[in-house]
Amino acid sequence: MRLHDWDNFYVIVGSSAAALTGLQFVVIALGAEVASLRDPTAVEAFGTPTIVHFCCVLTIGALVSVPGQTPFTLGSLFTFLGIAGVIYTIRTAHRAKLQSGYEPVLEDWLWHVAFPFGTYAALLITGASAFLYPAGALYFVAGVALSLLFIGIHNAWDSAVYISTRGRD
């Protein structure tokens, strides 16, 4: 398993996730003036998961960059992250149903529930397979990291557009 071959990839992806996490804080702060976003359950359903996705990408980058990682440690950590992500996505779906500040449409269910669920499930499976196929697992984990980054970017943009078009209530 040649982790050093992935250094630049995870520096770029992890740094992007960290920077976008900061920008999401700005989006949430701007959204404080929009009445429908004053419902904490709506923020938990549509804002917080974006931060979680970015932080997961940052965590993946950090884990791969730690010296001395073995297929066992990485596989275990990725499996744990995958399980946590699947559980968190199920909770996100429940929160999206409970909140009253916004009526989710199909696109919301896809980008906030279905795509993240599939991506975290892929991380879980990849983590479990890292014990048998460590080199191949690194490619799948890279795909998971990019998928979560793009899901987060889409959802952050969607939030920004929603806030800007709703105006001040």
Model-found features: residue ranges?
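Membrane-proximal helix-loop-helix units in multi-pass membrane proteins
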Residues: 63-120
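Alpha-helical transmembrane segments
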Residues: 5-20, 71-85, 140-147
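Terminal transmembrane helical module of multi-pass membrane proteins
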Residues: 122-169
